[in-house]
Amino acid sequence: MIQSQTHLNVADNSGARTIMCIRIIGSSNRRYAHIGDIIVAVIKDAVPNMTLEKSEVVRAVIVRTRKELKRDNGIILRYDDNAAVIIDKEGNPKGTRIFGAIPRELRKLNFNKIVSLAPEVL
């Protein structure tokens, strides 16, 4: 469960290393975000000489959470970290590579470009 002020790792090569959630896109008073939700975040740590810089406000989709994800068939997914992929206004990733495993629930939410770039889909 991701809420405001939560720090997340960035799972792509867009230039950001860590981001902090400042808003959850959706309802006006939504408290928590889960896998597949879009958040507004600020970059807290970035790689030097890249397009994204520290303190820049971006949109990101959550791809991994430490809170377990329960599927209809009884399988429970839990990851070691909270991670997100930075996206643009159309929902396409800003980076060209995705690091780490991605859940298949993102395909149902029309993040097909992220799923196709991922090395492993669980």
Curated annotation (Swiss-Prot):
GO terms for cellular component: cytosolic large ribosomal subunit; plastid. One of its GO terms (molecular function) is structural constituent of ribosome. One of its GO terms (biological process) is translation. InterPro entries: Ribosomal_uL14, Ribosomal_uL14_bac-type, Ribosomal_uL14_CS, Ribosomal_uL14_sf. It is found in: Plastid. Belongs to the universal ribosomal protein uL14 family. NCBIfam families: rplN_bact (TIGR01067). This is Large ribosomal subunit protein uL14c.
